[in-house]
């Protein structure tokens, strides 16, 4: 199904849904950095008012996904290298905290299925170069941690970070050896969570993010 036909299904949508559709296009790189979002085209496509489109632009701008530039309009944000390092610094702290809270709050046995998922299934997926399976494992891990951490402020901050770094994360798993390293690192995090050791789980998760930042530093000219 082509993009035009897919998009025809989302006409006349609510303000929240309009934001979500545009967010997904940006995060998936259907709208890559530097792309211009044109009010007139969007009002026609979605059959909504220009005021509603501007409202959606305001939400996306607050999330750091677009910027509104005088005489140019709304443009998808292009991350600079320094910003990416800053995002990794914040992710390290916040993801570490999420893992800590999840470990402290979740009942025993909560992580058994994820431990199994990151075992043979994830390893076999990497061996056959099924990186989408690995990315899905990461998404499941994040969602479960967010649910168990049960902190709406923290989860909102992390959602914003994931939106801004989603494409980069997908590119990073293509770096030789990175996906397998990620599986091993998540195995270690989950083992600590399964044991109820919040201190170790947090530190292990923070090392995982530092490792990702180091991989980005090594291969950044191929990733940007």
Predicted regions and their residues:
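Short helix-capping and inter-helix turn/linker motifs at the boundaries of alpha-helical repeat units
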Residues: 13, 112, 179-180
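An acidic, carboxylate-rich microenvironment
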Residues: 17, 41, 83, 133, ...
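Short, surface-exposed helix/turn micro-motifs that flank interaction/cofactor sites
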Residues: 27, 54, 61, 146, ...
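Conserved amphipathic alpha-helical segments that form helical-bundle/coiled-coil interaction surfaces
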Residues: 87, 108-171, 183-192, 200-211
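Mobile beta-alpha loop/short-helix "lid" or hinge segments that flank ligand
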Residues: 62, 66-67, 161-163, 177-180
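Long, hydrophobic, amphipathic alpha-helical segments used as structural scaffolds
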Residues: 102-106, 149-153, 169-176, 216, ...
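Short linear motifs at protein or domain termini
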Residues: 1-104, 213-224
